[in-house]
From Swiss-Prot:
It is found in: Cytoplasm. It comes from Salmonella arizonae (strain ATCC BAA-731 / CDC346-86 / RSK2980). In the N-terminal section; belongs to the N-acetylglucosamine-1-phosphate uridyltransferase family. In the C-terminal section; belongs to the transferase hexapeptide repeat family. Its cofactor is Mg(2+). The keyword Magnesium applies. Homotrimer. This is Bifunctional protein GlmU. Pathway: Nucleotide-sugar biosynthesis; UDP-N-acetyl-alpha-D-glucosamine biosynthesis; N-acetyl-alpha-D-glucosamine 1-phosphate from alpha-D-glucosamine 6-phosphate (route II): step 2/2; Nucleotide-sugar biosynthesis; UDP-N-acetyl-alpha-D-glucosamine biosynthesis; UDP-N-acetyl-alpha-D-glucosamine from N-acetyl-alpha-D-glucosamine 1-phosphate: step 1/1; Bacterial outer membrane biogenesis; LPS lipid A biosynthesis. Its main location: cytoplasm. The gene is glmU. Coiled coil: none annotated.
Length: 455
């Protein structure tokens, strides 16, 4: 019976030279999240009691980026192979727990595959994840005798006959803690690379008469690693295609699945329609019958039923109640809130502002640090002047207010219910309910005016 306790070791010490970057390889992002974070999340979802992260290059940046994860940090000062990396983590292994070995640059490994690997691990043996490739060049080959796994031969150490083998090692395996420590202590670096290979424990286990169970992933892409940006971009497209397929099968209409990116989590209702080149980031909720036009970016926002977001709008940390419309070219920044039926049109920006039920801001407007009531009309070119160079101040506009075009509201200021602000007005003092307020420079007419000419 398999012990349920399990720790996970994630190898993340490589320099990633072929990325040509100052950022550690495992921190390069896939779907908006560091590659290693995908692996950590899988380990946690699998129920790991502890996640050990073996690091080397860029340790400070790794620790800063992953500071919210409950990790045991294991330093590999010299990169002397995968076996050497595991040797650094071995003192933390419990004898009775299982140890699952993963890689920080293999981001698409699925929880389902890892569950099957864990369940397939024989008592006292090893569970090994393998795949068959048409072109296995460069990979360690799985050797078998009478169908049983007997070892792994690295490509550089393989004979011509062994290089014909199509089944290769993915590097992902699981074994008992006490067994793992014993096998790790027996590793040598007598090979072409002069490194300590974790793969040598397969032969050690076989020599002890232990069973090695080989498991295949649902998709080969789950085990593909990243060594350069071309490989990373390829995995990005594979991941996005998988997410798009899931959404389509769940009833979301993606007009072109190849031109949609999900960089987080999307909860959705029925009959949602998403046009091309839309990016969803963070945690986003779309209600029933939501329509999103081409080129939009939605991040960490809640969009209510029957809302329509027209093309090239950006919505971040915002909330839209049902039946709101925004765009095209609208920008809702953090703290923007639209109540039911509100409308924000083209080139309107909102930040930390609330737009009441049925209220409209149609064109060329900035609403910041504002609380706007119901059924308010905000004319084109209106600006809430909320910043004095040092501090932010609030604008409050009551229900049923009409704000004419080209109005400036110099905060802090309050406009009462039913008030009318004439076009071109600069409001610097509070306005009472139902008042008309206007401030304009007198209009001057000069007959026969001659324009200046260039000298």
């Amino acid at each position: 019976m398999l012990n349920s306790a399990m720790s996970v070791v994630i190898l993340a010490a490589g320099k990633g030279t072929r990325m040509y970057s100052d950022i550690p390889k495992v921190l390069h992002t896939l779907a908006g999240k560091a590659m290693v974070q995908h692996v950590i999340d899988a380990a946690n979802e699998l129920g790991a009691s502890q996640v050990h992260l073996v690091y080397g290059h860029g340790g400070d940046l790794l620790k800063q980026t992953l500071k919210n994860d409950n990790l045991n940090w294991v330093l590999q000062a010299e990169q002397l192979g995968t076996g050497h990396a595991m040797q650094q983590a071995a003192p933390f292994f419990g004898d009775d727990e299982n140890i699952l070995m993963l890689y920080g640059d293999v981001p698409l490994i699925s929880v389902e595959t890892l569950q099957r690997l864990r369940d397939a691990k024989p008592q006292g043996g090893i569970g090994l994840l393998t795949v068959k490739l048409d072109d296995p060049s460069g990979y360690g080959r799985i050797t078998r005798v009478n169908g049983k796994v007997t070892g792994i031969v690295e490509h550089k150490d393989a004979t011509d006959e062994q290089r014909q083998i199509k089944e290769i090692n993915t590097g992902i395996l699981i074994a008992n803690g006490a067994d793992m420590k014993r096998w790790l202590s027996k590793l040598t670096n007598n090979n072409a690379q002069g490194e300590y290979y974790i793969t040598d424990i397969i032969a050690l286990a076989y020599q002890e008469g232990r069973e090695i169970a080989a498991v295949h992933p649902a998709r080969i892409s789950e085990t593909e690693g990243v060594n350069n940006r071309l490989q990373l971009s390829r995995l990005e497209r594979i991941y996005q295609a998988e997410q798009a397929e899931k959404l389509l099968l769940a009833g979301v209409m993606l007009r072109d699945p190849a031109r949609f990116d999900l960089r987080g989590n999307l909860a959705h209702g029925r009959d949602v329609e998403i046009d091309t080149n839309v990016i969803i980031e963070g945690n986003v909720t779309l209600g029933h019958r939501v329509k999103i036009g081409t080129g939009c970016i939605i991040k960490n926002s809640v969009i209510g039923d029957d809302c329509e977001i027209s093309p090239y709008s950006v919505v971040e940390d915002a909330r839209l109640d049902p039946a709101c419309t925004i765009g095209p070219f609208a920008r809702l920044r953090p703290g923007a809130e639209l109540l039911a039926g509100a409308h924000v049109g083209n080139f309107v920006e909102m930040k930390k502002a609330r737009l009441g039920k049925g209220s409209k801001a149609g064109h060329l407007t900035y609403l910041g640090d504002a609380d706007i009531g119901d059924n308010v009309n905000i004319g084109a070119g209106t600006i809430t002047c909320n910043y004095d160079g040092a501090n932010k101040f609030k604008t409050i506009i009551g229900d049923d207010v009409f704000v004419g075009s080209d109005t400036q509201l110099v905060a802090p200021v309050t406009v009462g219910k039913g008030a009318t602000i004439a076009a071109g007005t600069t409001v610097t003092r509070n306005v009472a309910d139902n008042e008309l307020v206007l401030s304009r420079v007198p209009q001057v007419h000069k007959q026969g005016w001659q324009r200046p000419v260039k000298k």
